[in-house]
Amino acid sequence: MKKILLAVAAASLISFFSWADDALLKTGHPDEYTVKKGDTLWDISGTFLNSPWLWPEIWHVNPQIENPHLIFPGDLIKLIYLDGQPRITVERTLKMVPGAGGTTKLSPSIRVQQTEDAISAIPLDKIEVFLSRSRIVEPGVLEASPYILAGQQQHVIVGAGDRAYARGKFDSQYSNYSIYRKGQVFKDPVTKELLGVYAQGIGTVSVAKIDDDIATLDIVRTYEEVRSGDNLLPSEDRSVDSIFFPSAPDVDIEAQIVAVEGGVSQVGKFNVVMINRGEREGLQVGNVLAIYKTGEIVADRVRGGKVALPDERSGLLMVFRTFEKMSFALVLEADRALAINDKARNP
């Protein structure tokens, strides 16, 4: 009898794992896929998985290739089974190269590829401004920083090659500064805690010389017209980090959308949004959250009074840059118009 029960339990366990595998993999998924230029990891993950944020759970590193965590155009993504469990791995395209004595040999083409050629998790053109230009700073940081006085002969500063003057306390260890303009001040919609200040990236400068508290600057790059009063902060020593992977948060997250790029109130697919949770709460770059449309308040014409309708799941977003108390995220799916104060939770 004991053996029979063990056999039934084993069969049930196998059946459960088989069901779990079926639930993980998308119906009609391919067995392999050749990566094309313009693909994103989110697209590829969604080709194989019902829940693209489960990519880390099914990804299998191929130790036989260089940069095994990166995926390049031309790579072959394959669905394989290891110990009966589905795994996704990558095979790198091989090419023929001349060898000694007129022979040829196979060589991984990645040896001539640069890591910046790797596909990104989400479309870079949608988030580049928020990755490399703008940022969130603590209250008072901009007010305490140096500021633009004027251009040469008090002319408007137009762009690269112009000269400008700034006033304030400059740190001699920094020769490159970024120009910022103070933007929206963010507060938590529930607790009213001050979350940070949006610093809009305007351009970059190099310090030519410093006389007391006056600095002579050479404008290196501008994204908008530089104005008197714009602030200067040391340029961030960071590259555009597009190499991250879709994942579910490690902790329970209850967030809200507090702002949308461009200051609009409605949110749609590929909009950048700011949410009121960050590194302090355990959010990481690549984390995916489900967006819930806040339920309407309606009148109960039978019993009287007002009733809040349930929140409805209406989309997905991915966090691509985190700060202490808030994060930037890209809306990847939206099946209806979303808005500020809509909620974001674990998927």
Model-derived features: where do they sit?
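Surface-exposed, polar/charged interaction patches used for macromolecular assembly or partner binding
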Residues: 2-7, 16-347
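Repetitive helical segments and hydrophobic/amphipathic motifs
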Residues: 11-12
